Every structure is written in C-alpha cells, then in structure tokens.
Regions:
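Short secondary-structure boundary segments
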Residues: 77, 121, 147
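C-terminal helix-cap and adjacent tail motif
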Residues: 3-20, 25, 89, 142-173
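A glycine-rich helix N-cap at a beta->alpha junction
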Residues: 66-73, 132-154
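Active-site helix/loop module of the DD-peptidase/beta-lactamase fold
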Residues: 119-136
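Glycine/small-residue-rich phosphate/adenosyl-binding loop
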Residues: 27-31, 35-101
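Structured binding elements
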Residues: 113
C-alpha cells in the first residue's frame, strides 16, 4: 500500500474478526514503533503486548473499549527519560513521543491490512495495578489491533474533516 492510500483508508475500527494477528505482522508493527522519531532520540515509549486470555480479562475490567480485538498494545512512556535536554529545552516530550510511536504503529497496521483504534478511555489505576506499571511510567493509551470484521465500517464522524484553510495558516494567524 502506498502512503496516500494508507492515510486515506485508515479509520478507527471498533469491530474485529476473531482471526489472530500473525506474529510477523505484530513484529513489523512493533518495529515501526521502535524506529519512530522521538525528541533527542530519548525513546521513552514502553509497550505492553496484550495477547493472552488472562491479560484480556484484566483489560476488560479497565475499559469498555477493547472491542474484542485479538491483540492490544498498552502504550506508556517513561517520565524519567522524556526530557530533551540537548539544547537546554526542559519541556517534557514523553506524551508527544509516545503519540508519535503509537501513530507509526497504527499506520503500519493499516499498511498490513489490520485495523486499529486509539483508546483513551480507561481506568489508569487498574491498568497500573493489573499490569505492574511502574510509577515513573505514564499511560498514554490502548491500541486494539486485528482484522476488521466483515461489517466493520467507519463511524459517521470519520469523514467530517475541516477544510484545510480552517486549520492551516501561512506566516501568521
């Protein structure tokens, strides 16, 4: 798939088939996240692969938005390495970096004809407890992954995009 096709056809999948995701495809998705750019190349992303029944039972207690996907990535970032101090910049970039990583993985999944959705609705305290997430790790989001069900369709809001002149300005607002 070429890049234009990837970004134009991707949508948030909320209904998955039971077909498992092949390990080689998961590896490609994780590799896309590994090589994603991060501020100062600090690489604060930390990813838990949720793939077995026991882990999914825990996920189901943490969010209603698992959509019965056969695979799910729990994306965190390590706050102790999130700063880019190379040029005296003290701003924390962990959330931005982990978002870039998650987006790269999402686009690679689309390239592999897998569906995804970025989930921000979850109970962080339960996730932290159930998956032993250290205190210095911040939870960014969940990404269910799988083959879209035969009747999966984009939500009504998917195609509602602003015109470019509503969001892009040249040289000043």
């Amino acid at each position: 798939m070429d890049y234009d096709e990837i970004i134009k056809t991707r949508y948030s999948v909320r209904k998955y088939s039971e077909e498992p995701v092949e390990q080689d495809k998961l590896n490609k998705i994780l590799q896309a996240g590994r090589i994603a750019p991060t501020a100062g190349n600090r690489q604060p992303q930390r990813i838990i692969v949720i793939e077995n029944e026991e882990a999914f039972e825990k996920i189901k207690q943490c969010t209603p938005c698992h959509f019965n996907a056969p695979l799910l990535l729990l994306v965190c970032y390590d706050k102790s390495v999130e700063n880019n101090n190379h040029y005296g910049d003290k701003r924390p970039y962990g959330q931005v970096d982990a978002s870039i990583v998650l987006t790269h993985m999402m686009l690679e999944a689309q390239n592999l004809e897998l569906g995804t959705v970025w989930v921000g609705l979850f109970n962080p305290a339960l996730l932290r407890e159930y998956f032993h997430i250290p205190n210095n790790y911040e939870i960014l989001g969940l990404m269910p992954i799988g083959y879209p069900d035969m009747d999966a369709i984009p939500s009504k809001m998917h195609s509602e995009k602003f015109l470019i002149d509503h969001t892009v300005f040249y040289n000043s607002f």
